[in-house]
Design a protein with these regions (language model features):
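Short coil/turn segments at beta-strand junctions that form active-site/ligand-binding loops
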Residues: 3, 64-67, 73, 157-158, ...
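N-terminal anchoring/stem segment of glycosyltransferases
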Residues: 1-66, 116, 185-196, 200, ...
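GT-A fold catalytic core of metal-dependent nucleotide-sugar glycosyltransferases
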Residues: 51-119
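Catalytic core and acceptor-binding pocket of nucleotide-sugar-dependent glycosyltransferases
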Residues: 119-207
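A structural signal for well-ordered alpha-helical scaffolds and beta->alpha junctions
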Residues: 17, 21, 50, 103, ...
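Short amphipathic alpha-helical segments and helix-helix/interface helices
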Residues: 25, 57-58, 81-85, 144-151, ...
Length: 207
């Protein structure tokens, strides 16, 4: 099996994400998946570090002649992602209705065709990120919301809604989809990061 896509991820050096990068890498090696995982310097906040996602993806699309499967670094591959090579679209990610928020774009697993349309989409995503700095308690400013806005603006961009097993949040989706076996499971390290950095003991992020 020789995939035509490259799995990519990045993490902030000297943080808890560094250990998780090793877990992700081992899971990719289990299925002989070509991958590139990059370490970056801390940009000053979790919000800025997450907004780096679009820049990172742009860099890879411009430097590689491959389609890209981006995953957050706290993810692990549980089986070979058979769906990905067969996708006939420009972009694919999961849009999910949660009880606390509907129509939520999940950018933790994101497939991108390496073509000019997608590159224009990523440029627009970056523009939206730069226009409104992310704020932790305002989901409408998060990078994934800007990604969704950019995708919906571009009516010629072919979108596919990934099934839940490809962006399987380890606890919430286990309850929502009890009979679904995850292909790519996400462990939501951002929750721990927020708890450590917030002085309010009752603080909780729904992600």
């Amino acid at each position: 099996m020789s995939p035509q896509f490259l799995v990519i991820a990045y993490y902030t050096e000297s943080t808890s994400y560094e250990v998780l990068a090793g877990n992700l890498k081992r899971s990719l090696q289990n299925f002989s998946l070509p991958h590139y995982i990059e370490a970056i310097n801390d940009l000053g906040s979790w919000e800025k570090n997450t907004h780096h996602k679009a820049y990172f993806i742009k860099e890879i699309l411009n430097s590689r002649n491959q389609d890209v499967l981006y995953v957050d670094v706290d993810a692990q591959f549980k089986s070979y992602p058979d769906l990905i090579p067969s996708l006939d679209c420009d972009i694919a990610y999961r849009t999910q209705d949660f009880k606390w928020r509907a129509d939520e774009a999940l950018s933790g697993t994101l497939f991108l065709k390496n073509n000019d349309k997608v590159k224009r989409f990523v440029d627009r995503w970056i523009e939206l990120n730069e226009a409104v700095p992310a704020e932790r308690m305002k989901p409408e400013t998060w990078e994934q919301k800007n990604m969704q806005r950019a995708q919906r603006e571009m009516t010629d961009l072919v979108y596919y809604n990934l099934p839940p097993e490809y962006t399987f949040i380890y606890d919430h989706m286990k309850i929502m989809y009890p009979r679904t076996t995850p292909v790519i499971e996400h462990y939501q390290e951002s929750r721990n990061v927020h708890k450590r950095s917030n002085s309010n003991p009752n603080f909780r992020v729904r992600r």
